[in-house]
Amino acid sequence: MNSYWLNVYKPRGISSAKLVSIIKKVLGKVKIGHSGTLDVEAEGVLPLAIGEATKLVQMLIDAKKTYIFTVKFGKQTDSGDYAGKVIAITDYIPSKENAYAICSKFIGTITQIPPAFSALKVNGVRAYKLARDGKEVELKPRNITIYDLKCLNYDEQNATATYYAECSKGTYIRTLAEDLALSLQSLGFVIELRRTQVGIFKEENSIRIDSFNDITKLSLEEKNIKIEAILDDILVLDANDEQAQKIKYGQKCLFDYDKNVDFMWVRYKGVLLTIGSLNKNCFHSLRVFNLTQ
């Protein structure tokens, strides 16, 4: 077994890269990828692609994600979360009614400017490294989509509100929290952030690691999720011996299927062989997988 998914829950206080390096050390010589960095101060679902599953990571990067986050009103920090230094203060705290009502304003496609403290690169350098050095960071605005946003709880005494968000790739929750606060004529920053779902991978089914010293290769492999799991709702065709050989050698391959398909996968002897598209019965391979039964 060398190609599968692991639905790992990243705890607060450790970087995504560090978590990957720990898992890699346990599993040995194997390629590992993940679906998108979680901030050190954040926690939650971090699906890991093992072996050939890394060829499907882009699908998870593009998938919808859900978060639960808590905003502290009245202050703004340079990083957008509690780890940063306070750069602005206001006495105005939004009402409970407004904290709930503002959500509808953000649902749909909106423009967002990524935070300076982010992993995006500026002239080859990570933005957060420039920001930490006190250098000015200019990042271009981008369009993102908020599919759902709702206030789950409002704590008047502590001036906080907890929100649930379902969003597209490229969404920065710290920026969303700041924009929510600004729209409420206040300031705010994130004090808690938890990613609850990435595509098919959900928080309730994730691997909780209480102690990294207790991780074993066997304990991880027992929690494996088959590589095809994220393809379950996508068209699949079965290849015969001749078709499979042509696909493996990058040759033209025809299927008896009348419709054009932008994205699909092909199975050979019950195992994922390739992903690609179909145009006028001709299959065009995007990725070929080296898997065995």
From Swiss-Prot:
Ranges annotated as spanning the membrane: none
Keyword tRNA processing in annotation: yes
This enzyme's EC code(s): 5.4.99.25
CDD domains: PseudoU_synth_EcTruB (cd02573)
Record field: catalytic activity: uridine(55) in tRNA = pseudouridine(55) in tRNA
SUPFAM superfamilies hit by this protein: Pseudouridine synthase
Pfam families: TruB_C_2, TruB_N
Cystine pairings recorded for this chain: none
Keywords (A to Z) from UniProt: Isomerase, tRNA processing
GO molecular function: RNA binding; tRNA pseudouridine(55) synthase activity
Gene3D superfamilies attached to this UniProt entry: Pseudouridine synthase
One GO process term, biological-process aspect: mRNA pseudouridine synthesis
Active site annotation, chain numbering: D39
General function of this protein: Responsible for synthesis of pseudouridine from uracil-55 in the psi GC loop of transfer RNAs.
Family: Belongs to the pseudouridine synthase TruB family. Type 1 subfamily.
Name of the featured protein: tRNA pseudouridine synthase B
Source species of the chain: Rickettsia bellii (strain RML369-C)
